[in-house]
């Protein structure tokens, strides 16, 4: 099963720049790998992240979202003190969006890859 997940930062703060952005992507890929999921595509924008993920049928999408948000928040805030200053208690907004995707992933991959055109963020 494939899911398109979107996580927004708390208060929609634009905190993902340069090395924080790259590190967020690395951390999320590692978490998904540890969960046995396939990270098909990821795009970290200044205030949100899009992930296309293949999830085994033994795990629920909400469990994956919860783990990715919880662990990435903890690790990023530990590594980058500036995040604790900008967003005191938690990195992510409490809710997230995730939608099941069929087997034709091309349109979703295109959409995720081209977020910078929509939001003006990095490629």
Task: Label every model-predicted segment.
Residues 1-123:
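Charge-rich, low-complexity N-terminal segments
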